[in-house]
């Protein structure tokens, strides 16, 4: 068996096309164009690339994108004051603060300062809590994008044994909640997990987000399983690889996401979907 590739790039492009059409329809109806504020503190090269991709995608679908590139020395107090301004700005539907932040700024304080109805990253405790209570509104972008990828396979998720490897606030934990909502029997694995191989070998669906190249050997993948690889790791020779040993895993899986071109584009597409949702549901 050779796995079918889940083409995140193509699915994300389709979502962006639909969003562009909706924005055009809003304009024609005399409605406001959705606005997204993107804040970057410092000059982390990876963050700069991510932020650039998000801004470009915003412009492609016709959103207003407002950029704030702040120096590393920018204080926490000043950043919180900027967020307060944007919270009160009626032209801004979503506020995105690129993580990680410099050491002198507390991530949780910044995330919680963003008004929940403008939290298009889906990180605010209110929005995570809504997901936990099975009434999601603004959902965490990467897990939301992954659910779109899984749905594209046509596989019924109810009753599947799912394993999430990684328990971060950004991917692993909300991913577990999304899979529970989709009817999976879900196991979350982390650095204290024992018998990881045994758990992976039994899984119908595996989502891996640990940031370690080839962390999951391909032979662990159960024949016919769905494999979602969230990792993007750059090797010394410049090659980008995921957290799963792709070549071998692709021989066992029924569906697999490539790296790059799998989960990454969907994270941005979900961010755009959340921004339009915030405009329509909260701010129109």
UniProtKB/Swiss-Prot annotation:
Q: What is its EC number?
A: 1.5.1.5, 3.5.4.9
Pathway it works in: One-carbon metabolism; tetrahydrofolate interconversion
Q: Which GO terms describe its molecular function?
A: methenyltetrahydrofolate cyclohydrolase activity; methylenetetrahydrofolate dehydrogenase (NADP+) activity
NCBIfam families attached to this UniProt entry: PRK10792.1, PRK14186.1
Give the UniProt family note.
Belongs to the tetrahydrofolate dehydrogenase/cyclohydrolase family.
Note the CDD domains from the entry.
NAD_bind_m-THF_DH_Cyclohyd
Record's GO cellular component, any one? cytosol
| Gene Ontology terms describing biological process | L-histidine biosynthetic process; methionine biosynthetic process; purine nucleotide biosynthetic process; tetrahydrofolate interconversion
Q: Does the keyword Oxidoreductase apply?
A: yes
Question: In its keyword annotation, does this UniProt entry include Repressor?
Answer: no
**Which reaction does this enzyme catalyse, per its entry?**
(6R)-5,10-methylene-5,6,7,8-tetrahydrofolate + NADP(+) = (6R)-5,10-methenyltetrahydrofolate + NADPH; (6R)-5,10-methenyltetrahydrofolate + H2O = (6R)-10-formyltetrahydrofolate + H(+)
SUPFAM superfamilies the record matches: Aminoacid dehydrogenase-like, N-terminal domain (SSF53223), NAD(P)-binding Rossmann-fold domains (SSF51735)
Q: List, alphabetically, the Pfam families matched.
A: THF_DHG_CYH, THF_DHG_CYH_C
Q: How does it assemble?
A: Homodimer.
- Binding-site residues for NADP(+), renumbered to this chain: 166-168, 232
- Its recorded name reads Bifunctional protein FolD
Organism (species): Shewanella sp. (strain ANA-3)
State the source organism's domain of life. Answer: Bacteria
What's in the keyword line of the UniProt record?
Answer: Amino-acid biosynthesis, Histidine biosynthesis, Hydrolase, Methionine biosynthesis, Multifunctional enzyme, NADP, One-carbon metabolism, Oxidoreductase, Purine biosynthesis
Instruction: Give a short account of what the protein does.
Output: Catalyzes the oxidation of 5,10-methylenetetrahydrofolate to 5,10-methenyltetrahydrofolate and then the hydrolysis of 5,10-methenyltetrahydrofolate to 10-formyltetrahydrofolate.
């Amino acid at each position: 068996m050779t796995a079918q590739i889940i083409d995140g790039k193509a699915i994300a492009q389709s979502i962006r096309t639909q969003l562009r059409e909706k924005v055009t329809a809003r304009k024609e109806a005399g409605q406001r164009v959705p606005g997204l504020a993107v804040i970057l503190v410092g000059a982390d090269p990876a963050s700069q690339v991510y932020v650039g991709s998000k801004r470009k995608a915003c412009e492609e679908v016709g959103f207003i994108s407002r950029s704030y590139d702040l120096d590393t020395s920018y204080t926490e107090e000043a950043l919180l004051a900027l967020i307060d301004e944007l919270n009160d700005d009626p032209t801004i539907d979503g506020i995105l603060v690129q993580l990680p932040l410099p050491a002198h700024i507390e991530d949780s304080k910044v995330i919680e300062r963003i008004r929940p109805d403008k939290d298009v990253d889906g990180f605010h405790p209110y929005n995570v809590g809504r997901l936990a209570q099975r009434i999601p509104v603004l959902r965490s972008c990467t897990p939301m994008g992954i659910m779109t990828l899984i749905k594209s396979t046509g596989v019924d998720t109810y009753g599947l044994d799912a394993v999430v490897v990684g328990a971060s606030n950004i991917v692993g934990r909300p991913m577990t909640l999304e899979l529970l909502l989709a009817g999976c029997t879900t196991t979350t694995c982390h650095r204290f997990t024992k018998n990881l191989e045994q758990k992976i070998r039994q899984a119908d669906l595996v989502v891996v987000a640990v940031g370690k190249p080839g962390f999951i050997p391909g032979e662990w993948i159960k024949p016919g399983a769905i494999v979602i690889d969230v990792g993007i790791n750059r090797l010394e020779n410049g090659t980008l690889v995921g957290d799963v040993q792709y070549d071998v895993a692709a021989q066992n899986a029924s569906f697999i996401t490539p790296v790059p071109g799998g989960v990454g584009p969907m994270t941005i597409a979900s961010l755009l979907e959340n921004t339009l949702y915030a405009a329509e549901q909260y701010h129109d």
